[in-house]
């Protein structure tokens, strides 16, 4: 997929880029797979802001995605490649031989008319989903389960892929996009290929209005707030933050402070951390 620029009719338009969406084949989603979404504005049931910078944005319908791929040994034909406003990857509408329709995450190279299959006996072909036990070492995969039958949880965003590094007994070693190598049980399923929309990471949003359409509100610097609103706030004019290191709005150290629990149960499944050389 290509990225297009714009004539500099305004200063923000000069830097702005956008995907050309060449792979998209239809603009009308499948009605039976849509669910209404209610906006929260980042507020909880008490009306208090629990997540900042959320609000507004274009109306969306949620597309029900099949992350389990549990309809085994029944071929499904790709009918369309569609845009999904709820994720960075494109989605594919597939119709099974028995007539059932489902959405799946579209991998790179999947085209209208292609056939995808799930199940242990599936071929090693882009878009097919099978247990890691049946995938050859070295294969590039995405949509990886952490618990068998729960549905894919890892490597689902645009342009991402993982690689199967080794298999030994009940566990496999998978290198994730971050560089982390992790144990994953061989019964867990994964899909062959790389997630679509690879150019997403080089798109320049360019202007605030596009972020507002996405439902993202402005981020105010702590140094321009009052001292009762942020640890960096207060002072006369442009004052120092008044701390040895930057702080979050709630007073905890920011920028590099480790927030992961040091005795997390999943530590035993991490073979190599993403920062290790």
From Swiss-Prot:
GO terms for cellular component: large ribosomal subunit. The lineage of its organism: Bacteria, Bacillati, Bacillota, Clostridia, Eubacteriales. GO terms for biological process: cytoplasmic translation. InterPro entries: NA-bd_OB-fold, Rib_uL2_dom2, Ribosomal_uL2, Ribosomal_uL2_bac/org-type, Ribosomal_uL2_C, Ribosomal_uL2_CS, Ribosomal_uL2_dom3, Ribosomal_uL2_RNA-bd_dom. One of the primary rRNA binding proteins. Required for association of the 30S and 50S subunits to form the 70S ribosome, for tRNA binding and peptide bond formation. It has been suggested to have peptidyltransferase activity; this is somewhat controversial. Makes several contacts with the 16S rRNA in the 70S ribosome. Part of the 50S ribosomal subunit. Forms a bridge to the 30S subunit in the 70S ribosome. The gene is rplB. The keyword Ribonucleoprotein applies. It comes from Clostridium botulinum (strain 657 / Type Ba4). This is Large ribosomal subunit protein uL2. It comes from the Bacteria.
């Amino acid at each position: 997929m290509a990225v297009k620029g714009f004539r500099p009719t305004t200063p923000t338009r000069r830097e702005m880029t956008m995907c050309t969406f060449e792979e998209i084949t239809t603009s009308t989603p499948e009605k039976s797979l849509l669910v209404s979404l209610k906006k929260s504005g980042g507020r909880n049931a008490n009306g208090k802001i629990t997540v900042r910078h959320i609000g507004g944005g274009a109306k969306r319908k949620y597309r029900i995605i099949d992350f389990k791929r549990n309809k085994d040994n029944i071929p499904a034909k790709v009918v369309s490649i569609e845009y999904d406003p709820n994720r960075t990857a494109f989605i594919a509408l597939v119709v099974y031989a028995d007539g059932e329709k489902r959405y799946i995450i579209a991998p790179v190279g999947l085209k209208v008319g292609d056939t995808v299959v799930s199940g242990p006996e599936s071929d090693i072909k882009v878009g097919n989903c099978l247990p890691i036990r049946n995938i050859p070492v070295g294969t590039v995969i995405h949509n990886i389960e952490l618990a068998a039958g729960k549905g894919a949880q890892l490597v689902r965003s645009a342009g991402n892929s993982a690689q199967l590094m080794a298999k030994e007994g009940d566990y496999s070693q998978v290198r994730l996009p971050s560089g982390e190598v992790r144990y994953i049980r061989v019964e867990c399923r994964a899909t062959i290929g790389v997630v679509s929309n690879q150019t997403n990471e080089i798109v320049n949003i360019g202007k605030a209005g596009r972020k507002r359409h996405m439902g993202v509100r402005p981020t105010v610097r702590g140094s321009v707030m009052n001292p009762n609103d942020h640890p960096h706030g207060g002072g006369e004019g442009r004052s120092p933050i008044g701390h040895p290191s930057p702080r979050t709005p709630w007073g905890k150290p920011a920028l590099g402070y480790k927030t992961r629990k040091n005795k997390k149960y999943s530590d035993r499944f991490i073979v190599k951390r993403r920062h290790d050389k």
